[in-house]
A protein has these predicted regions:
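Structural and coupling elements of P-loop NTPases
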Residues: 1-526
Length: 526
């Protein structure tokens, strides 16, 4: 029977990040394929395609996009792997950012034809703040792509991280012949599409004269020159990888499965067991026998038939056991978690035990909030808070049918507690109308869809001009007396704090100039 340390040591928990359509969902499914978690890979190809394994919400199946973060666990070569699949659509939510807080490392998928794109930059920034290892998979090499050296240079320039090519592509598109593995000094030949089946590969050394016969003299010479050029660059540094300052780069084609298995094997070899987390009492030993976890995501109505609400927890230390009494630090209550579940998108499975590094979902009766800490009785430390990100888009929202006020309030509050939206109110006003703020505008569509389908409430939604929000730390006057510029408003959150919403950074100067005692703070909290 494995020891606690052995079980924890085989855990690998990582997030996959990318810009829309870079191939993230396809790569995720190929990982699951190798782990035996799915029998075949189903690629997302727009609205007519079958729904991908990691897309479970109805709106995701309709649109062929991921708008919530899925959690998937599978076994492979002795490792227990937890994948946090983040939305790839350009409009995403705070849920995406928070999911990255539960990961120990990240896989960054880049479209070989497009390079570094806007959402990649946003997600990378969150990973970089945590200094977690970031591995790069440059995808779609079976199509026409940009120069591979140019792509690596762009990653370094745009993202501020060094790169080291673990393998090197031989051509691209119709000329794509395979990749050269620099460490093993071998060539894996690309043999065309495999459509979800495990790929067969041929191997030949770089110095082998038969390489010229196989690739052609010109292509073989080009490969030898490029590999020699790479050899004159920086050395591989494992410590830099683990510090998040050097990204190992792999080339391949997720759609055809080429390069996916070698990438997964190298990724598992280079990553470490779950990392220790910081609490208000210092760093918590991941191998401690005492269970502890934090809530990073709340999702309501994953199963519409059950009207349930799940809190997703990242286990940070020790071993979780079903039906054992634990302690919810924020409320001071003891609780018994009798139906812990692991996920494969919307598919669930009750688990009897789980270890540090694992993600479990537990039924939430309304007790949990994002960032909460759960420990064994007698331990009262709290893990560092989960960031709150400033919303960039705002709408005034009210129910079309005033008789549905109760459902409206319940729905907006529950969806806000999940972190998909932030809700505010006009000071002194009731809850018949709220201001909704989001990070990405798609969340308005998701919010409207869920309110109608889960709470039976049709909404009246009016766009507002604000794109910034600041917390009022102090002021010399009553909020009603603040001198406002055009396109600014005083709001209140549900912790009764006052905030200023406004249009454009220039407004800060106006507001502070005309309100001498006004002190504004960034709403981001960690």
């Amino acid at each position: 029977m494995p020891t606690l340390e052995e079980e924890i040591s085989r855990r690998r928990t990582f997030a996959i990040i990318s810009h829309p359509d870079a191939g993230k969902t396809t790569l995720t499914e190929k990982f699951l394929l190798y782990g035996g978690a799915i029998a075949q890979a189903g690629e997302v190809k727009g609205k007519r395609a079958k729904a991908a394994t990691s897309d479970w919400m109805e709106i995701e199946k309709q649109r062929g996009i991921s708008v919530t973060s899925s959690v998937m666990q599978f076994q492979h070569n002795g490792f227990c792997i937890n994948i946090l699949d983040t939305p790839g659509h350009q409009d995403f939510s705070e849920d995406t950012y928070r999911t990255l807080m539960a990961a120990d490392s990240a896989v960054m998928v880049i479209d070989g034809a497009k390079g570094v794109e806007p959402q990649t930059r946003k997600l990378f920034k969150v990973c970089a703040l945590r200094h977690i290892p970031i591995f790069t998979f440059i995808n779609k090499m079976d199509r026409e792509t940009r120069d591979p050296l140019e792509l690596c240079e762009e990653v370094e320039r745009e993202l501020g991280i060094d790169t080291y090519a673990m393998n090197w592509p031989i051509g691209c598109g119709k000329e794509f012949a395979g990749v050269y593995d620099r460490e093993k000094q071998r060539i894996l030949f690309f043999s065309g599409e495999t459509k979800g089946k495990k790929v067969n590969s041929m191997e030949v050394a770089l110095e082998d004269p038969t390489l010229d016969e196989t690739l052609g003299a010109e292509k073989a010479a080009k490969l030898r020159d490029e590999v020699e050029l790479l050899g004159a660059g920086r050395d591989f540094d494992m410590q830099a990888v683990r510090n998040g300052t050097l990204s190992p780069v792999f080339f391949g084609s997720a759609l055809t499965t080429f390069g996916v298995e070698p990438f997964l094997e190298e990724f598992l070899r280079m990553t470490t067991a779950p990392l220790p987390r910081v609490s208000d009492e210092g760093e918590v030993d991941v191998f401690s026998p005492d269970f502890s976890a934090f809530v990073f995501k709340i999702q309501a109505n994953m199963n519409k038939a059950h009207r349930d609400r799940l809190a997703f927890m990242r286990i940070c230390s020790g071993k979780f056991e079903r039906d054992t009494e634990y302690y919810h630090v924020q409320s001071g209550k003891k609780l018994r978690l009798s139906q812990p579940q692991t996920m494969m998108a919307a598919e669930r499975e009750i688990v009897e035990e789980a270890y540090a590094g694992d993600i479990i979902g537990v039924f939430d009766p309304g007790l949990f909030a994002i960032g909460d800490t759960i420990t064994v009785p007698g331990k009262k430390f709290r893990y560092s808070g989960i960031p709150t990100f400033e919303p960039e888009h705002f709408m005034r929202v009210s129910p079309k049918d005033t008789m549905k006020r109760k459902q409206f309030i319940k729905g907006t509050e529950q969806i806000a507690q999940e972190g998909a939206i932030q809700i505010f109110k006009i000071p002194g006003a009731g809850l018949e109308e709220v201001i909704v703020g989001v990070v990405g505008t798609l969340q308005f569509d998701v919010f409207e869809y869920r309110m109608k389908n889960e709470y039976n409430v049709d909404l009246r939604m009016t766009s507002l001009p604000y794109d910034h929000l600041r917390l009022i730390e102090s002021m010399d006057c009553h909020p009603d007396e603040i001198v406002l510029c055009t396109g600014a408003a005083v709001l209140q959150d549900f912790r009764e704090r006052y905030l200023l919403a406004f249009d454009g950074e220039w407004s800060v100067g106006f507001l502070t100039k005309h309100n001498p005692g006004l002190v504004l703070a960034d709403t981001l909290s960690v």
